[in-house]
Amino acid sequence: VRQRDPAVELWSTPLLYLKGFHAIQSYRITHYLWQQNRKALAIYLQNQISVAFDVDIHPAAKIGHGIMFDHATGIVVGETSVIENNVSILQGVTLGGTGKECGDRHPKIHEGVMIGAGAKILGNIEVGKYAKIGANSVVLQPVPDYATAAGVPARIIGKDKDAKPAFDMNQNFIDLGM
């Protein structure tokens, strides 16, 4: 978090004050309980975590390491979502389904992705490694590796093979090298 968020000056800041960090660590407990087939307790705790932090992560979701929820308020991560390592997600993001379908129905977010504030990624689609999703975009189709997607509905507006969006946190969409 310290390398990505200029507001974090001390290593202790996330541990003490950042609810995104707290929500992810709390999720890890509920995920463990879910895997131990203690699903009722996992769902109960997840509900309490959602109330406390305004972050709703289903205990069955799979979340890697190096994840940053910046500001965190209003983040929703559905049951079959997968978030790989080193992903940055800003406030108001939803990784959701598209309706009442059952089974594997939520997005798969690959390594190094940055998802801008208010973005909605819906359905069992993949967002490729080091992709960038623009603020308030609605993503309904897969996004290739290193691509930038923005708009409603989202479309590919650029590609940058050198980008590391989860780390540089650059939300500027000008000069995308197309």
Q: What are the residue ranges of the model-derived segments?
A:
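Terminal amphipathic alpha-helical/low-complexity segments used for targeting or macromolecular assembly
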Residues: 1-49, 164-178
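Structural signal for interior beta-strand "rungs" in well-ordered beta-sheet cores
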Residues: 50-157
